[in-house]
């Protein structure tokens, strides 16, 4: 599963990375394909408690289904941070894709691996897969 900031404009980068990984023949757990799960056009969730619950439960279901979480460190995200913590707590591998410097220790601490570009990511995934 690829996760990153959806609410703060990162959904296109998530989709792009899913495409790259599919082209490299990785099995993808794509949490964005289901209808209604791309909420990038929603600017205020304060009066949408039911939708919030639905989105969070959906995303956590996909965290559970995943073997590896690839986290895009392109911008801060409440949801991504929670997904990282939960993934770590249930024994999933977390890879942080950090193309730019990271000015906080939190995502580094909750990552098993840190890569700086997609080529490093692909090499690491191949190593983790055993190939």
PLM-predicted stretches and their roles:
Residues 1-131:
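Conserved catalytic or regulatory cores that recognize and/or transform ribose-phosphate-containing ligands
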């Amino acid at each position: 599963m690829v996760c990153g900031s959806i609410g703060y404009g990162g959904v296109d980068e998530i989709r792009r990375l899913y495409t790259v990984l599919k082209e490299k023949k990785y099995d993808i757990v794509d949490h964005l394909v289901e209808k209604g799960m791309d909420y990038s056009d929603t600017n205020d969730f304060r009066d949408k408690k039911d939708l919030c619950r639905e989105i969070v439960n959906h995303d956590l279901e996909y965290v559970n289904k995943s073997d590896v979480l690839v986290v895009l460190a392109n911008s801060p995200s409440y949801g991504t941070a929670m997904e990282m913590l939960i993934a770590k707590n249930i024994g999933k591998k977390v890879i942080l894709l950090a193309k730019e410097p990271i000015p906080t220790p939190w995502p580094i601490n909750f990552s098993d691996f840190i890569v700086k570009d997609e080529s490093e990511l692909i090499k690491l995934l191949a190593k983790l897969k055993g190939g």
